């Protein structure tokens, strides 16, 4: 469904154009049997330039070949994702995905593409919350129902808990939220404090950030950092300075939403360096592939940050696909889309590889507090088989 809508246009154009091209190069409107089985532009069109049936423009053989190549490359869908040999386990983790804002179709597509686990960071919901009760309900959802919902589609769900910087500027509310955080930091499936850090880099954000660094130390949890959209370089440097001022070990901290301006210093200072595939505002997968080629895979992580806005829950699999197409080593791909996320977010033992290598059966007959993910459909009951040799 997701892939189909994305890839339908090039395929449709190719099919329509191909039929039209045959009409311009053959007396009959029906393509010959040989044409139907042609394996190249030269075989199909005899090496001639042809007229486009849509606009009347001219296509050279090389242009036609590119159209065919692009259409073939884009013809993947969630049920037929081409295999990428990895030299290791062929599975992916999306370590930053706001799944409460996504649909069950997204879970199905992610599972089909090889995603075995997601981490959902606590963040804001698109509008400011006004009382602590809304945070309590939200924290209960990402530590409860959302874990159940993901499991109904064969994906393990984990989360991070924290007071996000965007809403931290409400002083009274922030104090109330900070007071309730400890009750959730020991919940099953909580792998870090996050996402925390700076948004507008105000004194109030700084106060809330520092308080949560101390909570992470108290509960012996890693930290997931949100870096600001504006003045990112200064904000990222300030974030690392404050963490180090509090004596927090960089090896236990993921700095997320990096770009070309921040990557070197983040890695040089010993932090885990995560990249969010948001082409317009954060990081495009072409740019990410170039950075992996430049800096390598050590402590580098890829995520989608898919949420309620325009975003892509398949950003991690698509980026893996692109890196493979660019000739990046299979083990390097495996490290940035799977191994590194497991290493840092598995530190407290809540996230373990055995959770998906030895999975519980998917049984959509089960309920969560009386609620089902189904709406009249036949329940699926089976065990998800994880493919340990390819990324799908």
Q: Which residues make up each language-model segment?
A:
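Mid-to-C-terminal alpha-helical segments outside catalytic/metal-binding sites
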Residues: 2, 6, 13, 24-26, ...
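Catalytic pocket-lining loop regions of alpha/beta-barrel enzymes
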Residues: 210-294, 298-301
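Short, acidic/turn-prone active-site loops that include or flank metal/cofactor-
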Residues: 122-126, 277-282, 306-307
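Short acidic/histidine-rich active-site segments
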Residues: 295-313
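Short, charged, surface-exposed secondary-structure boundary motifs
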Residues: 128-131, 282-289, 310-312
